[in-house]
Regions:
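Hydrophobic membrane-insertion alpha-helices, especially the h-region
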Residues: 29-46
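Structural motif
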Residues: 48-49, 97-99, 135-139, 175-181, ...
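A short beta-strand motif characteristic of beta-propeller blades
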Residues: 62-75, 104-112, 143-150, 187-194, ...
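Non-cytosolic head/periplasmic domains of membrane-anchored proteins
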Residues: 109-214, 221
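Solenoidal tandem-repeat scaffolds enriched in leucines and small polar residues
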Residues: 176-270
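Hydrophobic beta-strand positions that form the internal "hydrophobic ladder"
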Residues: 90, 127, 166-167, 208-211, ...
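N-terminal Lys/Arg-rich, disordered targeting/topogenic segments
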Residues: 1-27
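Repeated scaffold domains used in trafficking and secretory/extracellular systems
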Residues: 70, 74-84, 113-125, 153-162, ...
């Protein structure tokens, strides 16, 4: 059949075919658009605590200086339990609220949180508060409460990672001594396990693939502490790796980066590589551990000689248990914290910023300081009943 000449009118059949082709194209485009809308809606729902408009609005408010208030911040008549650093804000946990303060000391948000005996974990974005000996937990961000729930039994310890995943160590049931549960940031149960061990501490890996349990038991009259690591991605009930320290009471445990977990006692730090179960132990000579802080690749230990009542040293130690810096300090130790690889030491007379290489800057502070965090080039110190900010020069 000869082709239709240019300019020749289309037949009715040709017009119908063109309409059908256009209709099919429109249907395909509508289907693609619908899928994209569904994907966007799901992503927004899953990450609303991160992308919520009020979060952006709050930051704009701070930039424009619409929040009022300044340092020092008075907390007279209010019981202040903890000071932390979250999402570039200083966060104060009181008897009744989580209070967020910007760099000027202005209050930018407060979240109701009235737990009589509170445990608090923080990451760069999330704050987890749990009722020790109770059953309530609350996960929040700078702008809102993400999850508020009750667990099955009394809480012993909690842990939190950067994804907002929460690990809860609680009293056991049905004949077990303890129960471990891990939830996502929305409160969905990801993992549960019961153990017949006297467990005291729990830690959650940054990637959410492992949970570590610290337990104690007596073997042949000797107290032994055990570090056990379990997989959250398999159904295996046995530990991936374990390490035991005889005649030692390990009392705190945290994850570093790259699958390393560290635990502390009065006289040592124990680092275990969960990839192979090999552990290294750092035991400072004739000194006891007063405090610690954990970064991504290093940790800092506050040490004091046995028999001494003042002065001491801060040791920066890497994952292999090798000290990389030693910093002497004077006075009475009060607090040690870590933000983004920098440590801040607080004594009764000064605060000191310390890098992983041992570089340091100090500033004199009032004598009633209890806790300290870094705020850019300032250090924020919690005293008996007020919060003060000091420039590090």
């Amino acid at each position: 059949m000869a082709k239709k000449q240019s300019g020749q009118p289309l037949t009715a059949e040709q017009k119908r075919q063109m309409r059908r082709r256009r209709s099919r194209r429109r249907a395909v485009l509508r289907g693609i658009a619908l899928v994209l809308v569904c994907v966007i809606v799901v992503l927004l729902w899953q990450n609303w605590d991160v992308v919520a408009p009020d979060r952006l609005y709050s930051h704009i408010q701070d930039l424009l200086g619409s929040s009022t208030g300044s340092y020092p911040v008075d907390f007279s008549g209010v019981g202040v339990q903890r000071l932390a650093r979250v999402d570039n804000y200083s966060v104060v946990l009181t008897d009744s609220h989580l209070i967020y303060l910007n760099q000027s000391g202005a209050e930018v948000n407060r979240i109701s949180c009235a737990y009589p005996s509170a445990l608090m974990c923080t990451t760069d974005q999330y704050v987890l508060v749990a009722e020790q000996g109770g059953r309530r937990i609350q996960l929040s961000t700078r702008t809102s409460v993400v999850t508020e729930m009750e667990v099955d039994n009394e809480i012993i310890a909690v842990a939190l990672n950067d994804k907002g995943q929460m690990a809860v160590l609680m009293q056991g049931s049905q004949g077990y001594l303890v129960q471990i549960k891990v939830y996502d940031r929305k409160g969905k149960l990801l993992y549960t396990r019961s153990r017949n061990q006297t467990a005291t501490e729990i830690a959650l890996s940054p990637d959410g693939r492992q949970v570590a349990l610290l337990s104690i038991k007596a073997l042949n009259g000797t107290l032994t502490s055990a570090m056990d690591v379990f997989s959250l991605t398999t159904s295996d009930t046995e530990a991936l790796c374990s390490h035991k320290e005889a005649d030692t009471l390990l009392y705190r445990m945290e994850y570093l980066s790259d699958g390393w977990v560290v635990a502390f006692s009065e006289d040592r730090a124990v680092m275990m590589d969960t990839a192979n179960g090999l552990a290294s132990v750092y035991v400072p000579s004739d000194m006891r551990v007063l405090g610690y802080a954990v970064g991504s690749d290093t940790m800092a230990l506050v040490l004091r000689s046995y028999g001494s009542t003042g002065d001491g040293e801060v040791h920066i130690v890497n994952k292999e248990g090798v000290p990389t810096a030693t910093i002497p300090f004077e006075g009475v130790y009060r607090d040690l914290s870590q933000q983004k690889g920098l440590y801040v030491l607080l004594t009764d007379t000064y605060a000191q910023r310390i890098t992983a290489n041992g570089e340091q800057v100090r500033v004199s502070v009032e004598e009633d300081g209890r806790q300290a965090v870094l705020d850019g080039d300032n250090v924020v110190v919690l005293g008996l009943n007020r919060l003060l900010s000091y420039p590090l020069t």
